[in-house]
Amino acid sequence: MKIVITGGEGFIGKALAAALSRRGVEVIIIDRTKGIEAKDFFDTVPDLHEADCVYHMAAQTSVFNTNHAQIMYDNIETFMAVCNACKRAGVKLVYASSSTANSPNTTSLYGISKRFNEEYARCYNPRATGVRLHNVYGPNPRQGTLLWHLLHDNPVRLVNGGRNVRHFTYIDDVVEGLIYAYGCNRQLINVANPEEMSVYDFALAVQMHNEAEISLLTEKREFDKIAQTVDESLFTVPLPYTSVKEGIRRVFDTIDNDTAQ
């Protein structure tokens, strides 16, 4: 079996690639850090190396990114190239969408770009499966995320008093959900931990392990949603989702193991 992963050096892509490799799958990684632009690759490679599936994980992933041109290129133009190439080659496409694509949650260009991808795939590649991911966390998190700051002992200031509620979903569960999507004939599914937790409680769960410095601010950002809801009209992959308490413990176990080596 042969799988192509765009963004295979990113937080989620790398975890997915490792899991597939452990299962004996041949993985081809397309990533900007390797000097390969996903859009260029899919614009020029007609047979997709006879892949069985393409996992499109490459994207600008921050709701804080205000570089509209960059988001348009990386999240929309590149997605269109990948989606079209998979349709031409008759190859299954699984792509990362986001909880921010759920209409009540869409308050940034990032969310708009993800919603566009869902609609584009629905119209032009109905075999594709989009996976709405919800606040993914785990060991070696992406730089600049809340968990990254907490793990690097950076003082963290939580807006809106830390009351914003999210469905923090552990990386291993996300990987299993993405693998499930390969054999799924639905156009759009959720991978979301059913456990709701405030951002403050998440930070406190981390603080129990490393005494991170946390302060609460009353201000609220314009694009913030107090509750990042899960669209219950969509199928949610039935997994034994990892509790946040257990997930954070695994994060620190990984740090301890890496330190000991």
Model-predicted regions and their roles:
Residues 107-111, 115, 119-166, 171-173, ...:
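NAD(P)-dependent short-chain dehydrogenase/reductase
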Residues 158-261:
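C-terminal substrate-binding subdomain of Rossmann-fold SDR/epimerase-dehydratase oxidoreductases
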Residues 38-74, 100-101:
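NAD(P)H-binding glycine-rich loop region in Rossmannoid oxidoreductase-like domains
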